[in-house]
Curated annotation (Swiss-Prot):
Disulfide bond sites: C26-C87, C39-C70, C62-C83
Protein name as it appears in the record: Anticoagulant protein rhipilin-2
SUPFAM superfamilies: BPTI-like (SSF57362)
Residues of the BPTI/Kunitz inhibitor domain: 26-87
Organism of provenance: Rhipicephalus haemaphysaloides (Tick)
CC terms in the record's Gene Ontology section: extracellular space
Record localization: Secreted
Length: 195
Protein backbone atom coordinates (compact mmCIF):
# COMPACT_ATOMS: atom_id res chain seq x y z
CA UNK A 1 0.00 0.00 0.00
CA UNK A 2 2.80 2.41 0.95
CA UNK A 3 4.63 1.66 -2.32
CA UNK A 4 1.45 2.31 -4.29
CA UNK A 5 0.95 5.66 -2.53
CA UNK A 6 4.61 6.54 -3.04
CA UNK A 7 4.32 5.75 -6.77
CA UNK A 8 1.22 7.95 -7.01
CA UNK A 9 3.06 10.75 -5.21
CA UNK A 10 5.99 10.52 -7.64
CA UNK A 11 3.62 10.55 -10.63
CA UNK A 12 1.76 13.57 -9.26
CA UNK A 13 5.04 15.36 -8.60
CA UNK A 14 6.33 14.78 -12.11
CA UNK A 15 3.05 15.85 -13.71
CA UNK A 16 2.71 18.97 -11.54
CA UNK A 17 6.38 19.92 -11.78
CA UNK A 18 7.19 23.12 -13.59
CA UNK A 19 10.76 22.00 -14.27
CA UNK A 20 12.28 22.92 -10.92
CA UNK A 21 16.04 22.76 -11.22
CA UNK A 22 16.85 24.10 -7.79
CA UNK A 23 17.72 21.63 -5.04
CA UNK A 24 18.62 21.98 -1.35
CA UNK A 25 21.87 23.87 -0.75
CA UNK A 26 24.61 22.35 1.39
CA UNK A 27 27.53 24.10 3.10
CA UNK A 28 30.65 24.26 0.90
CA UNK A 29 32.40 20.86 0.69
CA UNK A 30 29.32 19.09 2.11
CA UNK A 31 27.35 18.42 -1.08
CA UNK A 32 27.00 14.69 -1.66
CA UNK A 33 26.81 14.14 -5.42
CA UNK A 34 25.36 10.66 -4.91
CA UNK A 35 22.13 12.06 -3.46
CA UNK A 36 19.29 12.08 -5.98
CA UNK A 37 16.85 14.90 -5.26
CA UNK A 38 13.45 14.93 -6.95
CA UNK A 39 12.13 18.51 -6.98
CA UNK A 40 9.11 20.48 -8.13
CA UNK A 41 7.86 24.05 -7.84
CA UNK A 42 4.31 25.19 -7.21
CA UNK A 43 2.93 28.69 -6.60
CA UNK A 44 4.36 28.82 -3.06
CA UNK A 45 7.42 26.56 -2.63
CA UNK A 46 10.16 24.59 -4.23
CA UNK A 47 9.93 21.14 -2.67
CA UNK A 48 12.42 18.29 -2.95
CA UNK A 49 12.70 14.81 -1.52
CA UNK A 50 15.26 12.04 -1.40
CA UNK A 51 15.68 8.51 -0.03
CA UNK A 52 19.00 7.01 1.00
CA UNK A 53 20.33 3.49 1.48
CA UNK A 54 23.61 2.25 2.92
CA UNK A 55 25.42 -1.09 2.87
CA UNK A 56 25.60 -2.93 6.20
CA UNK A 57 28.71 -5.15 6.05
CA UNK A 58 27.63 -7.24 9.04
CA UNK A 59 24.42 -8.40 7.33
CA UNK A 60 25.57 -8.10 3.66
CA UNK A 61 22.38 -6.13 3.07
CA UNK A 62 21.40 -2.66 1.93
CA UNK A 63 19.22 -0.77 4.38
CA UNK A 64 17.38 2.53 4.31
CA UNK A 65 18.65 5.17 6.74
CA UNK A 66 17.77 8.65 7.97
CA UNK A 67 20.09 10.79 5.87
CA UNK A 68 19.93 14.54 6.57
CA UNK A 69 20.60 15.73 2.98
CA UNK A 70 24.25 16.93 3.02
CA UNK A 71 27.69 15.51 3.77
CA UNK A 72 28.10 11.98 4.97
CA UNK A 73 30.29 9.59 2.99
CA UNK A 74 30.28 7.38 -0.12
CA UNK A 75 28.27 4.62 1.59
CA UNK A 76 25.06 6.38 0.54
CA UNK A 77 22.97 5.29 -2.43
CA UNK A 78 19.74 6.74 -3.92
CA UNK A 79 18.09 3.34 -4.37
CA UNK A 80 18.33 -0.14 -2.95
CA UNK A 81 19.16 -1.39 -6.45
CA UNK A 82 22.15 0.97 -6.73
CA UNK A 83 23.35 -0.07 -3.26
CA UNK A 84 23.05 -3.79 -4.04
CA UNK A 85 24.77 -3.39 -7.40
CA UNK A 86 27.71 -1.57 -5.82
CA UNK A 87 28.12 -3.39 -2.53
CA UNK A 88 26.57 -6.81 -2.11
CA UNK A 89 29.40 -9.33 -2.44
CA UNK A 90 27.53 -12.64 -2.48
CA UNK A 91 25.44 -13.50 -5.52
CA UNK A 92 22.07 -15.07 -4.81
CA UNK A 93 21.09 -18.44 -6.27
CA UNK A 94 18.68 -16.58 -8.56
CA UNK A 95 21.49 -14.35 -9.91
CA UNK A 96 23.78 -17.30 -10.51
CA UNK A 97 21.04 -19.12 -12.46
CA UNK A 98 20.15 -15.93 -14.36
CA UNK A 99 23.73 -15.32 -15.52
CA UNK A 100 24.16 -19.01 -16.41
CA UNK A 101 21.03 -18.79 -18.59
CA UNK A 102 22.41 -15.74 -20.38
CA UNK A 103 25.30 -17.95 -21.44
CA UNK A 104 27.41 -14.85 -22.03
CA UNK A 105 30.98 -14.65 -20.82
CA UNK A 106 32.16 -11.21 -19.80
CA UNK A 107 35.85 -10.42 -20.05
CA UNK A 108 38.01 -9.84 -17.00
CA UNK A 109 40.29 -7.51 -18.98
CA UNK A 110 40.24 -3.84 -18.07
CA UNK A 111 40.33 -2.29 -21.53
CA UNK A 112 37.26 -0.20 -22.31
CA UNK A 113 36.13 2.82 -24.27
CA UNK A 114 35.10 5.72 -22.05
CA UNK A 115 31.40 6.49 -22.24
CA UNK A 116 28.37 7.24 -20.10
CA UNK A 117 27.21 3.75 -19.03
CA UNK A 118 28.20 2.80 -15.48
CA UNK A 119 29.63 -0.75 -15.28
CA UNK A 120 32.39 -2.69 -13.51
CA UNK A 121 35.76 -3.79 -14.84
CA UNK A 122 38.68 -5.71 -13.34
CA UNK A 123 41.67 -3.38 -12.92
CA UNK A 124 44.49 -5.68 -14.01
CA UNK A 125 47.13 -3.70 -12.10
CA UNK A 126 45.45 -3.68 -8.69
CA UNK A 127 43.42 -6.86 -9.36
CA UNK A 128 40.29 -5.14 -8.00
CA UNK A 129 36.83 -4.72 -9.48
CA UNK A 130 36.21 -1.02 -10.09
CA UNK A 131 33.36 1.11 -11.39
CA UNK A 132 33.96 2.67 -14.81
CA UNK A 133 31.92 4.72 -17.27
CA UNK A 134 32.02 2.71 -20.49
CA UNK A 135 30.70 3.12 -24.02
CA UNK A 136 29.47 -0.47 -24.56
CA UNK A 137 27.76 -1.71 -21.40
CA UNK A 138 26.97 -5.16 -22.80
CA UNK A 139 30.56 -6.38 -22.60
CA UNK A 140 31.27 -5.26 -19.03
CA UNK A 141 29.98 -6.36 -15.63
CA UNK A 142 26.58 -4.94 -14.60
CA UNK A 143 27.35 -5.23 -10.88
CA UNK A 144 30.28 -5.33 -8.49
CA UNK A 145 29.34 -8.81 -7.28
CA UNK A 146 29.20 -10.25 -10.82
CA UNK A 147 32.74 -8.94 -11.43
CA UNK A 148 33.90 -10.49 -8.13
CA UNK A 149 32.14 -13.78 -8.93
CA UNK A 150 33.67 -14.14 -12.42
CA UNK A 151 37.13 -12.62 -11.98
CA UNK A 152 38.09 -13.59 -8.39
CA UNK A 153 39.98 -10.34 -7.65
CA UNK A 154 42.37 -9.77 -4.73
CA UNK A 155 39.82 -7.61 -2.92
CA UNK A 156 36.16 -8.54 -2.71
CA UNK A 157 34.92 -5.37 -1.05
CA UNK A 158 34.04 -2.14 -2.81
CA UNK A 159 35.73 0.91 -1.20
CA UNK A 160 32.39 2.82 -1.44
CA UNK A 161 30.85 0.30 0.91
CA UNK A 162 33.52 -0.04 3.60
CA UNK A 163 32.53 3.14 5.45
CA UNK A 164 30.15 3.10 8.38
CA UNK A 165 26.81 4.84 7.92
CA UNK A 166 26.92 8.65 8.35
CA UNK A 167 23.66 10.59 8.59
CA UNK A 168 25.20 13.85 7.34
CA UNK A 169 23.94 17.37 8.06
CA UNK A 170 20.89 19.43 7.10
CA UNK A 171 20.84 21.78 4.08
CA UNK A 172 21.37 25.51 4.64
CA UNK A 173 18.57 28.00 5.26
CA UNK A 174 16.15 28.94 3.76
CA UNK A 175 15.62 25.19 3.17
CA UNK A 176 13.47 23.51 5.83
CA UNK A 177 13.54 19.72 6.03
CA UNK A 178 11.39 17.10 7.68
CA UNK A 179 11.06 13.35 7.51
CA UNK A 180 7.80 11.92 6.24
CA UNK A 181 7.73 8.41 7.72
CA UNK A 182 4.77 7.24 5.65
CA UNK A 183 6.89 7.76 2.51
CA UNK A 184 10.25 6.92 4.15
CA UNK A 185 11.74 10.01 2.57
CA UNK A 186 13.38 13.29 3.56
CA UNK A 187 11.37 16.27 2.28
CA UNK A 188 12.90 19.76 2.05
CA UNK A 189 11.11 22.91 0.97
CA UNK A 190 11.92 26.56 0.42
CA UNK A 191 9.42 29.41 -0.03
CA UNK A 192 9.37 30.45 -3.69
CA UNK A 193 10.47 34.05 -3.10
CA UNK A 194 13.35 33.31 -0.71
CA UNK A 195 16.95 33.43 -1.88
Amino acid sequence: MVLCCFALLITAVLVASKGAEEKPTCDPDHENKKVLWTCWTDDYNTTCFERSFYYNRQTDRCEEFLYEGCGGNDNNFPSIEDCLSNCKTNMTDYEIKFFQRLNKTLSCTSTYEKGSISRYILNETSQECQRADVKNGDIHFPSFRKCVYDCKPNSTSNPYCNSIKENGTKPRAPWNCYRQDGYKALFCYKPKNSK
